[in-house]
Regions:
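A structural signal for small-residue-enriched, beta-sheet-centric alpha/beta enzyme cores
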Residues: 181-182, 211-348
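An N-terminal, well-structured beta->alpha segment
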Residues: 72-118
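N-terminal amphipathic/basic leader segments beginning at the initiator methionine
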Residues: 18-81
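Short glycine-rich or small-residue beta-strand-to-loop segments that form or flank ligand, phosphate
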Residues: 87-91, 131-142, 180-184
Length: 348
């Protein structure tokens, strides 16, 4: 193992768990966009500035976890901005079951409605329809990244009705003022998404932005079956290490609610998920020395060991389910229906 991990090009090394690593690789993060997964890293302990609640609907198996990052202490501990993070987990989302997807849409719509209410975005309070801009983030040409654009394909926009029939049209019919845009990715447009949205927001003056995006997860079991809703905005590309200008209330001037589904996971994270099984197998096979060595390394060191072995061979690869096209298509309907239910109520 020592020989395998030795790198002549980089003389500076550090010893982790009895194994020498390249110093340059020691600083890293296990990439995930899910606040729930960040919270799970410190499962069982109370974290100052973090509040967690969870509940499950037995009849549907839909599980909801609420992670609230309350202040700077929580922000530092979790690595997530202050805000509310709601995670809907439903294993049956992996199947094509229209009735079940509708149940998830209803649950998500209720959570979205509640989050809008927290920000004072209610027709009753405002005395007029809520003006909402839905943004479909991602690259429509790359299936795992096409969730946002797909949701926009199913969106029932209404803003144009005001332009055609008068500014009172939506209020009279009980409709929200709903518009949408798919800004593409920087490689296609040459512009940051935030730059595009600032122009659109200045012209259309929405009360809120709903940003839909594909996310990265740490665990394979969450791919395509987990939906995260957050009022902390969104940071395009952060889950795969591709940092872009953030889309937040501070940068755009209106509340930004993010809806995301993990569609990719890092190859090293997949291997990390199997370390426990590997350790057990090594011990059972009489290789207790190697098993004990890996077992006694903490999760961070295990992950670093895996990256040290894996990435020189294949690079920082990301993996997606084989039927991701079908999953993205189904989930795009689920999310678009949730948006319609939350904003139209019984008038959609």
């Amino acid at each position: 193992i020592h020989k395998l991990l030795f790198c002549e090009k980089n003389k500076e090394k550090v010893e982790i768990g009895g194994v020498f690593m390249r110093q340059a690789d020691v600083e890293f993060t296990v990439r995930t966009d899910l606040a729930l997964e960040e919270r799970e890293k410190v499962q069982g302990s109370e974290i100052p500035g973090i509040r967690v609640r969870e509940w499950e609907k037995e009849e549907t198996g839909i599980r909801v976890t609420e992670v609230a990052v309350c202040d700077e202490r929580g922000e530092k501990a979790l690595g997530k901005p202050v805000g509310m993070y709601l995670t809907v987990e439903a294993a049956s989302l992996a199947k094509k079951d229209d009735d079940y997807h509708r149940e998830v849409s209803e649950e998500l719509a209720g959570l979205l409605r509640g989050m809008l209410k927290e920000h004072g975005l209610e027709t009753e309070k405002m005395g007029r329809p809520v003006r909402t801009l839905v943004v479909g983030l991602g690259n429509p040409e790359a299936t795992p990244d096409a969730l946002g654009p797909k949701v926009l394909e199913h969106l029932q926009a209404t803003r144009h009705l005001e332009l055609e029939y008068g500014t009172d049209f939506c209020r009279k019919h009980g409709y929200p003022v709903l518009s949408g845009i798919t800004p593409g990715v920087m490689a296609q447009t040459g512009m940051e998404t935030a730059e595009i949205l600032k122009g659109v927001i200045a012209e259309t003056r929405p009360d809120a932005v709903l940003a839909v995006d594909a996310l990265a997860a740490r665990s394979v079991r969450r791919l395509g079956v987990t939906i995260q809703l957050s009022d902390a905005g969104i940071h395009p590309g952060s889950g795969v290490g591709n940092h872009r200008n953030s889309l937040t209330r501070e940068t755009l001037g209106v509340p930004v609610i993010a809806i995301g589904v993990p569609t990719v996971v890092g190859a090293a994270a997949i291997v990390h998920d199997t370390v426990g099984a590997l350790v057990a197998a090594l011990k059972e096979g009489g290789e207790a020395g190697y098993g004990d060595m890996v077992e006694h390394m903490d999760g961070r060191d295990q992950y670093q060991l895996i990256r040290e072995v894996l990435e020189p061979q294949i690079g920082p690869m990301y993996v997606t389910p084989h039927n991701i096209d079908e999953r993205v298509e189904n989930l795009s309907f689920t999310i678009s229906e949730a948006i319609h239910m939350a904003l139209f109520g019984g008038n959609g």
